[in-house]
């Protein structure tokens, strides 16, 4: 009869329903889940108090609004979009985001602070989902995610675009944990369009894509991400393409030595030199390759062994689907988060200059990274506190910068010494799941 369900479809539907119910039940059995909700509530109250009683710090808001006003006024030459801090140096996604902010707040600071307070809580919720799903950090240590004075300031007292970029980045990571690779790549590209620091995650993300999907899936995911960049920049690409690309994607900018939080101890003439930048880049790339070969691809026989095992450059999959390369195994959530957080952290350690708002680029990964090291808990907590203190020294000093670099390097050593676990888990057959539920 038309509309009648077959026994097989009924069994599959029952399996999916039971799986969802069990996942919800298991999730709420974890002490981390109610504790995470309590943290969100407590931090929401704290954010409200900060907005109400701590004076706003004027830094980039007026410049943002000036640049947005020029864009809304019809200016499409990126070289002419300027504020009191200089020309616009972010991709066009920044303009769309802050145009929406201006429309919602009228360009006023106080309602913008409320909006950023909501953004802070949304970002915290997404990060807590990542932590709960991976279950690497003990439940009580989730409180560390709410204890940064500098991060609260970046979100609700400074209103930096880093806040939107990192929220989108964390959202893309959450999607990757649910194996929504194509949708996650679209969100990731959206984050890049707000601020390019998100590209620090790109090398490890590419590796994960190669592990998670076949060649067709990888190419289509990358094409989707590229399409986002084209569509976002289209008004500028069809009018003043050279100006847009030169200003929005300038990778050669030299930051002011005075504001450097991480390399203040380096003499200014060395700090601004091309040789120093090249040395940092070489160290960055070397460590990325080393971690990829000996940590992230260890179980596949290193990078070369991994590429050979996939026949990536030699053959296309027999089925032009967007599914995983191997139907019997998937990447563990821990491997996804560890690779992305560590890859980004390597870039942070060897960034020539970290300004105060750049702390948001990796703060939310710190508890996770510390608990991936073999260090005792007391040392992890001391290092977390030490990094937070370094970021709250204003202005930074050679001593605070030197201490920050030392703490970063110790974490890197700990991550290198940590054992490499199998990045794959077996995917159970649906029938075996039905038998388990019965």
UniProtKB/Swiss-Prot annotation:
InterPro entries linked: Glycosyltransferase_ALG3
Deletion phenotype: No obvious phenotype under normal and high temperature or salt/osmotic stress conditions.
Enzyme Commission code: 2.4.1.258
GO CC term (a single one): endoplasmic reticulum membrane
Residues with glycosylation annotation: 23, 103
Disulfide-linked positions: none
Transmembrane segments: 32-52, 78-100, 112-132, 155-177, 196-216, 218-238, 271-291, 330-350, 374-394, 401-421
Pfam families: ALG3 (PF05208)
Name of the protein described by the UniProt record: Dol-P-Man:Man(5)GlcNAc(2)-PP-Dol alpha-1,3-mannosyltransferase
Lineage summary: Eukaryota, Viridiplantae, Streptophyta, Embryophyta, Tracheophyta
Gene behind the chain: ALG3
């Amino acid at each position: 009869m038309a509309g009648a369900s077959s026994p097989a479809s009924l069994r599959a539907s029952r399996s999916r329903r039971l799986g969802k119910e069990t996942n919800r039940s298991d999730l709420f059995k974890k002490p981390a889940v109610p504790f995470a909700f309590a943290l969100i509530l407590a931090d929401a109250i704290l954010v409200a108090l900060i907005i109400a009683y701590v004076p706003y710090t004027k830094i980039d808001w007026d410049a943002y609004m000036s640049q947005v006003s020029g864009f809304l006024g019809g200016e499409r030459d990126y070289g002419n979009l300027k504020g009191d801090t200089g020309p616009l140096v972010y991709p066009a996604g920044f303009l769309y985001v802050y145009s929406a902010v201006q429309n919602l707040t009228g360009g006023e600071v106080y309602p913008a602070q409320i909006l950023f307070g909501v953004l802070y809580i949304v970002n915290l919720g997404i990060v807590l989902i990542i932590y709960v799903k991976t279950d690497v950090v003990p439940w009580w240590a989730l409180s560390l995610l709410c204890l940064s004075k500098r991060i609260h300031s970046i979100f609700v007292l400074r209103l930096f675009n880093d806040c939107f970029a990192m929220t989108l980045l964390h959202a893309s990571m959450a999607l990757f944990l649910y194996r929504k690779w194509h949708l996650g790549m679209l969100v990731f590209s959206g984050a890049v369009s707000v601020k390019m620091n998100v590209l620090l995650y790109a090398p490890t993300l590419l590796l994960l894509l190669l592990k998670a999907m076949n060649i067709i899936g990888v190419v289509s995911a990358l094409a989707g991400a590229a399409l986002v960049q084209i569509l976002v920049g289209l008004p500028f690409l069809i009018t003043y393409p050279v100006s847009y690309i030169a200003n929005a994607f300038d990778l050669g900018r030299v930051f002011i030595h005075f504001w450097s939080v991480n390399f203040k101890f380096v003499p200014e003439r060395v700090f601004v030199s091309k040789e120093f930048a090249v040395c940092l880049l070489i160290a960055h790339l070397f460590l990325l390759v080393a971690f990829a070969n000996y940590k992230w691809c260890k179980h596949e026989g290193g990078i070369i062994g991994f590429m050979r095992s996939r026949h990536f450059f030699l053959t296309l999959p027999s089925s032009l689907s967007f599914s995983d390369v191997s139907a019997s195994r998937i990447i563990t959530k821990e491997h996804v988060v560890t690779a992305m957080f560590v890859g980004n952290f390597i870039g942070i350690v060897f960034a020539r200059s970290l300004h105060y708002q750049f702390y948001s680029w990796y703060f939310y990964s710190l508890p996770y990274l510390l608990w991936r090291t073999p260090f005792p808990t007391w040392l992890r907590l001391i290092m977390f506190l030490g990094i937070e203190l370094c970021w709250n020294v204003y202005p930074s000093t050679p001593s605070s910068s030197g201490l920050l670099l030392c703490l970063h390097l110790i974490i890197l050593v700990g991550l290198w010494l940590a054992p490499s676990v199998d990045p794959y888990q077996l995917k159970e057959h649906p029938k075996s799941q039905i038998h388990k539920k019965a």
